[in-house]
UniProtKB/Swiss-Prot annotation:
One of its GO terms (molecular function) is hormone activity. One of its GO terms (biological process) is neuropeptide signaling pathway. The modification Pyrrolidone carboxylic acid is found at Q1. Glycans are attached at W8. The keyword Glycoprotein applies. It is found in: Secreted. PROSITE patterns: AKH. Coiled coil: none annotated. GO terms for cellular component: extracellular region. Keywords: Amidation, Glycoprotein, Hormone, Neuropeptide, Pyrrolidone carboxylic acid, Secreted. This is Hypertrehalosaemic factor 2. It comes from Carausius morosus (Indian stick insect).
Length: 10
């Protein structure tokens, strides 16, 4: 499973 953390979701 890949966990993606968007930086443009602040």
């Amino acid at each position: 499973q890949l966990t993606f953390t968007p930086n443009w979701g602040t």
